[in-house]
Swiss-Prot record:
Pfam families: Peptidase_S24
Keyword Chaperone belongs to the record: no
Keywords: Endoplasmic reticulum, Hydrolase, Membrane, Protease, Signal-anchor, Transmembrane, Transmembrane helix
Similarity comment: Belongs to the peptidase S26B family.
Membrane side Cytoplasmic: residue ranges: 1-6
Role: Catalytic component of the signal peptidase complex (SPC) which catalyzes the cleavage of N-terminal signal sequences from nascent proteins as they are translocated into the lumen of the endoplasmic reticulum. Specifically cleaves N-terminal signal peptides that contain a hydrophobic alpha-helix (h-region) shorter than 18-20 amino acids.
Active site (UniProt): 44 (charge relay system), 83 (charge relay system), 109 (charge relay system)
Residue ranges, annotated region (C-terminal short (CTS) helix): 153-164
Species name: Eremothecium gossypii (strain ATCC 10895 / CBS 109.51 / FGSC 9923 / NRRL Y-1056)
Keyword Transmembrane: yes
Superkingdom field: Eukaryota
Protein name: Signal peptidase complex catalytic subunit SEC11
Length: 167
């Protein structure tokens, strides 16, 4: 294989990755969420959502209501949490404050929030409201993130397919 063919393959791979990145960023802008698609990682929302379900988020509402399923992140943790709003009210500045709980959990989420935080702030902590889902399709990402052998096998297969693939 000459240098021109190698450059063509590299450019094709680069364009594919750049297109995926632009699609993700475009989706982030449309949904107003830095993470418009998330995978359920635990069973805390069963039976509504199972581990491995892919959730589609929308963050253009000004307020959430009791019963909405939201995804939030707090300062202390970088993993998005999917739970239902069980209580809401406004602070003295008019900002919406939310209390959440997993459908399959006995207690609310106050213990998951940051230090000295009793409620989530709608304008600060919420990633988005769940608007749709695909069941079980997220298991691939769970497998890759939890199993280093699966991660290396997937990376190896992708590398081999890009090197050996023909036009």
């Amino acid at each position: 294989m000459n240098i021109r063919q190698q450059l063509t393959k590299f450019l094709g791979l680069f364009l594919t990755l750049a297109s995926a990145f632009m699609f993700w960023k475009g989706l982030s802008v449309v949904t107003n969420s830095h993470s418009p698609i998330v995978v359920v990682l635990s069973g805390s929302m069963e039976p509504a959502f199972q581990r491995g379900d892919i959730l589609f988020l929308w963050n253009r509402e000004r307020f959430n209501k009791v019963g909405d399923v939201i995804v939030y992140e707090v300062d202390a943790k970088s993993i998005p949490i999917v739970h239902r709003v069980v209580r809401e009210h406004r602070d003295k500045n008019g900002r919406q404050l939310l209390l959440t709980k997993g459908d399959n959990n006995a207690a609310d989420d106050i213990a998951l929030y940051g230090r000295k935080q009793s409620y989530l702030r709608r304008d600060k902590d919420i990633v988005g409201t769940v608007k749709g889902y695909l069941p079980k399709l997220g298991y691939v990402t769970i497998l890759v993130s939890e199993n280093q052998y699966a991660k290396f096998a997937l990376m190896g297969m992708l590398a081999l397919s890009s090197l050996l693939g023909s036009e």
